[in-house]
Amino acid sequence: MDWQGQKLVEQLMQILLVISGVVAVVVGYTTESFRTMMLIYAGGVVLTTLVTVPNWPFYNLHPLKWLDPSEAEKHPKPEVVSVASKKKFSKK
């Protein structure tokens, strides 16, 4: 799953859960049934899971383009600069 696919999954998850929650509350309130409300919401959670958890092909529309090893060797890695540790002195 590419990074744009991850963004899409996050948006779909939020939208589907909110819609299923609102529908569940409205139907549960109108039918005066807590059980119906919970079943509708559970169905929404299952549907959201089936849509967002598997790595569906439409989540891979923008694959990452990695550098070839020969190209990566041309660009050196950044050097790590060690920073002297600073001790915090407490006031007494």
From Swiss-Prot:
Keywords associated with the record: Endoplasmic reticulum, Membrane, Transmembrane, Transmembrane helix
Chain residue ranges for the region called Disordered: 73-92
Segments in the Cytoplasmic topological domain: 1-12, 60-92
Subcellular location: Endoplasmic reticulum membrane
Transmembrane segment boundaries: 13-30, 37-59
Stored InterPro entries: Spc1/SPCS1
Membrane side Lumenal: residue ranges: 31-36
Organism domain of life: Eukaryota
Membrane topology summary: Multi-pass membrane protein
One Gene Ontology CC term in the entry: signal peptidase complex
Family affiliation: Belongs to the SPCS1 family.
Complex and partners: Component of the signal peptidase complex (SPC) composed of a catalytic subunit SEC11 and three accessory subunits SPCS1, SPCS2 and SPCS3. The complex induces a local thinning of the ER membrane which is used to measure the length of the signal peptide (SP) h-region of protein substrates. This ensures the selectivity of the complex towards h-regions shorter than 18-20 amino acids.
Protein name in the entry: Signal peptidase complex subunit 1
